[in-house]
Regions:
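A generic structural signal for short beta-strands and their flanking turns/coil linkers
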Residues: 18, 62, 93-95
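Generic structural "secondary-structure junction" signal
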Residues: 21-24, 63, 68, 76, ...
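Short, intrinsically disordered, mixed-charge
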Residues: 37-38, 85, 150-153
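Phosphate/adenylate-binding glycine loop and adjacent helical scaffold
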Residues: 3-11, 15, 19, 107-108
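Well-ordered alpha/beta subsegment
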Residues: 116-121, 126-154
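Aromatic- and Lys/Arg-enriched surface recognition patch
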Residues: 79-126
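Short, well-structured hydrophobic secondary-structure segments
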Residues: 34-77
Length: 154
């Protein structure tokens, strides 16, 4: 399957607008879940730092999620609950993407590397993995998931 997504989401779409971000440093979904949970405990809330505030924030807040790319594939998502503008000690603006701490594991979907975040249309998001939040498929190796998907079993 060719990599999906080029960062452009200008075409109309039914459903909410989403964001996608690289999970830098995470080796798998469980590692990402642990890192995000640790940061949630340290901070008292779940958020992701970014320099640029999304111009289409309202469309994302209408049910959108932050999709996480782990090792070249979208693998999980967190619902976006808000955006908060902040300033650092030097007066530079940045944005916090507020997220629900709960993870939803998705079926793998290839995605090219990029920096920062990108918009993702509802038509381009991967399906949630069977089993719901934290799905039973989260422990399955990528190659097995891809094979089951190619066979039409998931």
């Amino acid at each position: 399957m060719p990599p999906r997504g080029n960062g452009h989401a200008s075409l109309p779409s039914s459903g909410p607008l989403h964001l996608v971000k690289m999970a830098v440093g995470a080796v798998d979904v469980d590692d990402l879940r642990r890192l995000r949970a640790q940061r949630h405990v340290e901070r008292g809330e779940s958020w992701v730092y970014t320099r640029n505030h999304p111009r289409r924030a309202e469309a994302v807040l209408d049910g959108g999620s932050l999709y996480w790319v782990v090792k070249g594939q979208i693998r999980a998502r967190q619902r976006v609950t808000g955006f908060r503008k902040e300033h650092d000690d030097n007066g530079r603006a940045y944005c916090l993407i507020l997220t629900d701490p709960e993870f939803v594991v998705t079926l793998p979907r290839a995605f090219r590397p990029f920096q920062g975040w990108r918009y993702l249309l509802s038509a381009d998001v991967p399906k949630d993995a069977p089993g719901g939040p934290g799905g039973d498929f989260s422990m399955m190796p990528d190659h097995m998931l891809m094979e089951l998907r190619e066979l039409g079993l998931i």
